[in-house]
């Protein structure tokens, strides 16, 4: 899978989120997903808190900022979809990360901004793939935990927000 960065911030931010390419590659090589992720691409947007508030209001009618939002695109799983994906690199959707809030939370929790963005990215990516911790029976929580442990990260976003 490839990442199509659409960064709404300065050049330094682009450099700092470049590691997401490697993170996504590592996630793909864990062998946790049925579909071949190399056939798809994913848009990642890094925005500030004000822009995230506006996006959250426009799409969820919540007039507050948040850390990560996901916008999956409807990708057919028909017989020809995999062939088409290999030829065209179909976009699965967009993950929007509040870079400003990620920096703040990382400082509060005593870990790097890169680790915080990694947690947000993993969480958003699983939503793109159709997982939903608000309605599933723990599938997203379990998979998120497996991924972060495999990558040596500290805590699941879902677990952190329920404690």
From Swiss-Prot:
Record-linked PROSITE patterns: UPF0054 (PS01306)
Pfam families: YbeY
Annotated positions binding Zn(2+): 123, 127, 133
Keywords linked to the UniProt accession: Cytoplasm, Endonuclease, Hydrolase, Metal-binding, Nuclease, Ribosome biogenesis, rRNA processing, Zinc
Enzyme Commission designation: 3.1.-.-
Location(s) in or outside the cell: Cytoplasm
Cofactor (UniProt): Zn(2+)
One annotated GO biological process: rRNA processing
GO cellular component terms, A-Z: cytoplasm
Domain of life of the native organism: Bacteria
Molecular-function annotations in GO: metalloendopeptidase activity; RNA endonuclease activity; zinc ion binding
Binding note for cofactor: Binds 1 zinc ion.
Hydrolase found in the keyword field: yes
Entries under SUPFAM superfamilies matching the protein: Metalloproteases ('zincins'), catalytic domain
InterPro entries: MetalPrtase_cat_dom_sf_prd, YbeY, YbeY_CS
NCBIfam families hit by this protein: rRNA maturation RNase YbeY
Role noted for this protein: Single strand-specific metallo-endoribonuclease involved in late-stage 70S ribosome quality control and in maturation of the 3' terminus of the 16S rRNA.
Family: Belongs to the endoribonuclease YbeY family.
Protein name in the entry: Endoribonuclease YbeY
Name of the gene encoding the protein in the UniProt record: ybeY
């Amino acid at each position: 899978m490839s990442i199509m960065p659409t960064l709404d911030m300065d050049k330094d931010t682009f450099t700092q989120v470049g590691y997401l390419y490697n993170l996504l590659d590592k996630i793909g090589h864990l062998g946790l997903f049925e579909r071949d992720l190399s056939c798809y691409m994913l848009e990642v947007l890094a925005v500030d808190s004000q822009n995230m508030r506006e996006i959250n209001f426009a799409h969820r009618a919540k007039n507050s900022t948040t850390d990560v939002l996901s916008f999956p695109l409807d990708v057919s799983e028909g017989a020809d979809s995999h062939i088409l994906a290999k030829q065209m690199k179909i976009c699965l959707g967009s993950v929007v990360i509040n870079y400003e809030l990620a920096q703040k939370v990382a400082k509060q929790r005593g870990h790097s901004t890169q680790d915080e963005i990694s947690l947000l990215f993993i969480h958003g990516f699983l939503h793109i793939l159709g997982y939903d911790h608000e309605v599933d029976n723990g599938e997203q929580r379990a998979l998120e935990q497996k991924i972060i442990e495999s990558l040596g990260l500290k805590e699941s976003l879902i677990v952190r927000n329920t404690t």
